[in-house]
Amino acid sequence: TDNNASHEQWQADLGFWTGSTGRSLLSLPSFETDVYSGSSPHAETMERRALSLWQMGQTFPHYLLLSARSLITRTVGPKEVAALGAKIKIDEDHSPDDLVERLAASGYVREDPIANVGQFSVRGGILDVWSPDTDAPVRIEFFGDTVDSIRVFDPDTQLSTQRLKETSIAPMR
């Protein structure tokens, strides 16, 4: 695509046609900033790129929509992206402190309570996090380093809406 505006239009059009193929359509928008200009890329663009890079390593098969500029832009490899994200399952051991460090390193912001994608909160043995690949945040309860429960919750009421056996946390940048 020529730019991010046409990229979004192509994504909407192609999304209609790829829905019946069983393949996901991933989007890798360009930064649209000159690396030497000193200006930072838009945060939403960074989030969308990080999510697509994460999903490329998680789901198969898929289509990838990108611009020529995105194609030539250097990016981190699949192992580095996987290291920034996390897959969490009940009864697995994960150090809550290590998860908090990983969240901060991958672009999440600590807020209490969380209200938006890309935020996390820690209270005792409870970690709330809202990953960009989910529609609602999850609450992960630990007993020591062992994951005791994973629940989807409503950010407005803070009430649990669904129990999960596992969840993934995609990087934000």
Can you name each region flagged by the protein language model?
Residues 1-173:
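ASCE RecA-like P-loop NTPase motor cores
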